[in-house]
C-alpha cells in the first residue's frame, strides 16, 4: 500500500472514531436553557467535577440591559454536561453599604476549587469596587462548606503588595522609580515606553499597593499546589502567584 493510501486510511479511521463523540456533543446550538427553561446566566466562570457531578459557576448578569451589572455568582449542576439545574446565587452582591461586594460592584471570572486540606470550597474572582469603574483591579476570595454555597466573602485586594517576583533584581527598582518621572514615558506605545514596560515600570508603580488583577483563572498542578494566573500591569502582562495551602 502506498504512503498516500495509508495516510488516507488513517484519516478516515480517525474521523469515524470521532463520530460517536460528535453525536454526543453537550450543546446542539441555540439558547442553552436550564431546568426552569431560562437562559443559563453564568458568564466567564468555570466547570469542575466533584463526586461525579459537574458544577458550573459564573457571573450572574442582570437582565435590565445595563452593561457590567452584576448580581453575584450563580451555580448550575449537571450529570451529563447537557442538562443543567439552576441553584441560584451562591455568592450574591451585598446590601451592606461600604462592603467590597456592595451592589453596583463588578464581579467577573469566578473560579471555584476544592481544598483537600481545609475541606472548603474556595472561590476566586476579579472584583471592581462600586463606583470606580475598572480602577480597583482587585482579586476577591470567598469560601463555603458545600459546593452549593452560600459562599462567605473573605476579602479583596491587590496581589503581592511589597513582594518582589522571583528573579527580579532589587537594584533595578531604583532606576524604574526614576523612569516613572520621565514625561516622555507618559505617552503609551512609544519604543521607549515599551522598553520600560518590559522591564517592569508599571510593576514598580504598583509595588507598594500590590499588583493589578483583572481577567484571571486558578490552576492546580499535579502536586496539589494552586496558582492564581491573572492579567496585570494595565492588562499588558500575565502574572502568576502561588497560593498558600489554605
Residue ranges and their predicted role:
Residues 1-25:
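Bacterial Sec-dependent N-terminal signal peptides
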Residues 22-246:
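Carbohydrate-active catalytic/glycan-binding domains of CAZyme proteins
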Amino acid at each position: 500500500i502506498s504512503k498516500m493510501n495509508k495516510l488516507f486510511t488513517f484519516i478516515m479511521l480517525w474521523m469515524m472514531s470521532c463520530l460517536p463523540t460528535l453525536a454526543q456533543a453537550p450543546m446542539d446550538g441555540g439558547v442553552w436553557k436550564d431546568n426552569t427553561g431560562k437562559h443559563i446566566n453564568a458568564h466567564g466562570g468555570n466547570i469542575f467535577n466533584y463526586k461525579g457531578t459537574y458544577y458550573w459557576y459564573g457571573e450572574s448578569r442582570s437582565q435590565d440591559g445595563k452593561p457590567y451589572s452584576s448580581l453575584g455568582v450563580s451555580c448550575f449542576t449537571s450529570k451529563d454536561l447537557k442538562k443543567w439545574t439552576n441553584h441560584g446565587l451562591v455568592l450574591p452582591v451585598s446590601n451592606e453599604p461600604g462592603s467590597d461586594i456592595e451592589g453596583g460592584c463588578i464581579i467577573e471570572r469566578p473560579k471555584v476549587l476544592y481544598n483537600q486540606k481545609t475541606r472548603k470550597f474556595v472561590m476566586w474572582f476579579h472584583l471592581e469596587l462600586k463606583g470606580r469603574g475598572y480602577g480597583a483591579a482587585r482579586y476577591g476570595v470567598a469560601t463555603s462548606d458545600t459546593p452549593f454555597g452560600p459562599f462567605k466573602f473573605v476579602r479583596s485586594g491587590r496581589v503581592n503588595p511589597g513582594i518582589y517576583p522571583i528573579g527580579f533584581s532589587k537594584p533595578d527598582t531604583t532606576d524604574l522609580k526614576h523612569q516613572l518621572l520621565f514625561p516622555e514615558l507618559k505617552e503609551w506605545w512609544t519604543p521607549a515606553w515599551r522598553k520600560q514596560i518590559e522591564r517592569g515600570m508599571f510593576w514598580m508603580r504598583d509595588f507598594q499597593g500590590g499588583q493589578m488583577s483583572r481577567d484571571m483563572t486558578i490552576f492546580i498542578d499535579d502536586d496539589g499546589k494552586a496558582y492564581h494566573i491573572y492579567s496585570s500591569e494595565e492588562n499588558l502582562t500575565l502574572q502568576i502567584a502561588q497560593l498558600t495551602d489554605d
